[in-house]
Amino acid sequence: MTFAVKFWGIRGSIACPSPEYIKYGGNTSCLEVIADDRHIVLDAGTGIRGLGKKFLAHDIREAHLLLTHTHWDHINGFPFFVPAYDPNRSIHIMAGHLNAEQGGIRYALSQQMDSPMFPVPLEAMRANLRFEDFEAGDEFNIAGVRVRTVPLNHPNGATGYRLEYNGK
């Protein structure tokens, strides 16, 4: 049984790609949780670009992406997540901090990739993208991984996640 976490990015606010930050890395928020053959990604900061390269190299075709919130440092790597452009892959994207007036997670990500902010629209991503909004405080399962959520005190709202698998 495998249950492991890898940090692909831990920086807040802005990526720091210089030698003085190499000890802890310079990418913004992105964590990979591996539960046997399941891949759950927390946040899509600049670290998701490297994770995408791993997904391609290891032919990982399915993942869940749980977003804590949609501040730039948590989503600005998403347009550079190459697996999202591959029609042979499936990504289930979830968020619990957006209310109906904010349009949901699909709308937030499409706005980030809309002209004039970005030259490639969300619709260019050919993977099977599923978008799901929930309410922070909900609990759900991802293929045997129990996910408990909690609302966080953060500007514009955020969601905390607790993942449990086989008693861990």
Predicted regions mapped to residue ranges:
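Binuclear metal-dependent hydrolase catalytic cores
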Residues: 1-168
